[in-house]
Regions:
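C-terminal alpha-helical "lid" subdomain
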Residues: 2-100
Length: 100
């Protein structure tokens, strides 16, 4: 998933001048994206797309964790989550517990 996320980030940065903080391919965010989508690329792209739209609608150029939370919580995107918890609001230790 990480190489896919790196390419998506490069494409979005180059074509839309939008970046991610934390970086989308970081261990933390990529793990959350995987847990939210089970790694299905179509679902990953829907999540990224909606997160970027949230950012642009708020006149910002940096996609934050809160944008992913809003996109995930909107429930208008198809997912196959690995947990029923909102993965983008959990702290890192809670993420680790889900992975165990």
């Amino acid at each position: 998933l990480t190489p896919f996320l790196k390419q998506a980030s490069l494409y979005i940065s180059k074509n839309f001048n939008i970046r991610f903080d934390p970086e989308i391919s970081s261990k933390d965010l990529s793990t959350r994206i995987f847990l939210a989508t089970s790694g299905y690329q179509a679902y990953v792209m829907q999540l990224i797309h909606q997160s970027c739209l949230n950012t642009m609608n708020n006149n910002r150029l940096v996609v934050s964790m809160s944008d992913f939370h809003a996109a995930y919580a909107s429930k208008n995107i198809l997912y196959k989550p690995m947990t029923q918890k909102n993965i983008f609001q959990l702290n890192p230790s809670q993420i680790t517990e889900i992975l165990i």
